Amino acid sequence: MRWQEFEGEVRRICEAHDFSTKFRFVFKDEEGRAEIDVVAERYGIVLCFDAKLYSASRYRASQLRREAEKHRRRCERFSALTGKRAIPVVVSLIDDSLRFHSGCIIVPYHSLNEFLTNLHFYLAEFGFL
């Protein structure tokens, strides 16, 4: 699977859970241009997804932590621009014990359906509700 297909799969799964989505959402602010792979909204909850297609040979937990920090910052910028509270979520193809870092939820791809099905539980668990 290529990264474009992976992003599309994240979007498709969100739509299957009745989220309205914006795909490859680009915005510009005083810090410059930024892109969020999938913005998914349902019942006033806005999830901003960054899809990471790491192969096992390229994957490092430290790299995922850095990406989570960068994505959280992008989501803060998105929130400031739109006035909507964005919840940052990184979806990784590689499963790792890391589930939350620096204000960003980390979901393994194979758990995305379960995460969206039990969304309110996870949002409460990580302090978003």
Curated annotation (Swiss-Prot):
SUPFAM superfamilies: Restriction endonuclease-like (SSF52980)
Name the record gives this protein: Uncharacterized protein AF_2330
Organism this protein belongs to: Archaeoglobus fulgidus (strain ATCC 49558 / DSM 4304 / JCM 9628 / NBRC 100126 / VC-16)
Highest classification ranks of the organism: Archaea, Methanobacteriati, Methanobacteriota, Archaeoglobi, Archaeoglobales
